[in-house]
């Protein structure tokens, strides 16, 4: 039954694609730039809340110093937008307010006694729901903190230090970059789930918003996409023409952006495994890309930088993931259709809802949704 339904949906999707045939492919368009008087070495954001580093000091997009701290190596935004985690060499991670200048909220000091050496933090990240904050250190540990008091909740001992971390949106998995391996940990049980060998040293890891995929960049100029259901490598992009960094998933999961050689932005279409768009820059100095959705109106943007600019790209022109949209719409309609109607007897229900009628109704809904999607797209164009 499932296979038949999937094929029916594919037919309907083909119908949509036919209607769109001949229309121009969607593209990112530069929307707005914020010029800085200072050179941008790194940045982070949560939606439109953006901070950047310049010569070890953190600033807002308006070149306003967030604190007087110097020698900052790395910053990570709390998804709430209210604070940032700040990493300095040989210093405890500190949490600073984004709203109040120089306001330190927490400091994650090591309080354990009897350690042979003081652990140094190497990587850090927040969970997408802002409830958890994790760091990796030089002892090979991954430390889990709550975000109310920033107290350690668990110490996960690995075989070697992790240099990049990602926490899945469903709080099921931690992905860590450990040499030539991606090590997956079960976030709930704190147990190792899987070690995935890679052909070269792993640079960065990033989960898709729905946690179904994991993007991995390695220092052999590859972008690898991994399915989190079975941890199989489902796509490898090894001909993008340079060293790849800063992978970021589009909110719908259909596209991934990467930076090539700290200069050009590449948008990869995961649906058909091709480059959707290249955004060449005039000079080296692009430090990252980050897709995000404006939660107020569901518009999608890509954030990047130039040496002296923060750049917002309008990503709403990218073609939607019609298969995923159709699946959700058809499933929602079917969930309503299979409900017993008011006054309907069990006998009547059994006649109305059976294997044959269910499949037929799925086909009708798939065609209906495909027609609606095609109509919406044509009206937009």
Predicted feature residues:
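WD40-repeat beta-propellers
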Residues: 59-61, 93-96, 142-145, 185, ...
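Short loop/turn segments that connect beta-strands within beta-propeller blades
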Residues: 62-64, 98-101, 147-150, 187-190, ...
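A short helix->beta-strand "capping" segment at the edge of beta-propeller domains
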Residues: 26-40, 61-64
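Short coil/turn segments within WD40 beta-propeller repeats
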Residues: 56, 91, 139-140, 180-182, ...
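Hydrophobic core register within WD40 beta-propeller blades
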Residues: 41-43, 50, 75, 124, ...
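Hydrophobic beta-strand positions that form the internal "hydrophobic ladder"
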Residues: 49-50, 84, 133, 174, ...
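Residue-level detector of Asp-centered blade-edge/turn motifs that repeat once per structural unit
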Residues: 45, 79-80, 128-129, 169-170, ...
């Amino acid at each position: 039954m499932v296979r038949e339904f999937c094929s029916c949906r594919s037919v309907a999707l083909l119908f949509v694609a036919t209607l769109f045939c001949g229309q121009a492919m969607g593209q990112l368009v530069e929307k707005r730039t914020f010029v800085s008087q200072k050179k941008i070495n790194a940045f982070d954001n949560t939606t439109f809340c953006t901070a950047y580093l310049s010569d070890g000091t953190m600033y807002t997009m308006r070149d306003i110093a967030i604190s007087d701290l110097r020698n900052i190596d790395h910053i990570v935004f709390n998804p709430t937008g209210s604070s940032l985690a700040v990493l300095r060499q040989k210093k405890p991670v500190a949490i600073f307010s984004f709203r109040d200048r120089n306001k330190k909220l927490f400091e994650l000091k090591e309080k354990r006694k009897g350690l042979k050496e003081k652990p140094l933090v190497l990587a850090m990240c927040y969970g997408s729901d802002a409830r958890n904050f994790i760091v990796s250190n030089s002892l090979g540990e991954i430390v889990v903190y709550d975000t109310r008091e920033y107290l350690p909740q668990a110490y996960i001992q690995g075989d070697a230090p992790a240099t990049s971390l990602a926490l899945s949106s469903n709080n099921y998995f931690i992905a860590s970059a450990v040499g030539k391996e991606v090590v997956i940990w079960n976030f709930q049980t704190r147990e190792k789930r899987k070690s995935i060998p890679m052909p070269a040293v792993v640079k960065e890891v990033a989960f898709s918003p729905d946690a179904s995929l994991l993007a991995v960049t390695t220092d052999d100029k590859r972008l690898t996409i991994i399915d989190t259901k079975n941890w199989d490598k489902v796509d490898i992009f090894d001909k993008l023409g340079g060293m790849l960094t800063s992978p970021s998933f589009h909110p719908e999961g259909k596209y991934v952006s990467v930076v090539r050689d700290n200069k050009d932005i590449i948008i990869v279409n995961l649906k058909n495994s091709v480059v959707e768009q290249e955004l060449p820059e005039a000079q080296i100095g692009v430090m990252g890309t980050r897709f995000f959705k404006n939660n107020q109106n569901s518009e999608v943007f890509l954030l990047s930088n130039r040496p002296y600019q923060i750049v917002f790209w309008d990503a709403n022109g990218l073609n939607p993931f019609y298969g995923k949209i159709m699946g959700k719409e058809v499933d929602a309609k079917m969930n309503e259709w299979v409900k017993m109607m008011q006054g309907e007897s069990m006998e009547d229900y059994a006649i109305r809802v059976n294997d044959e009628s269910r499949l037929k109704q799925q086909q009708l809904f798939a065609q209906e949704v495909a027609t609606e999607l095609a109509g919406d797209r044509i009206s937009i164009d």
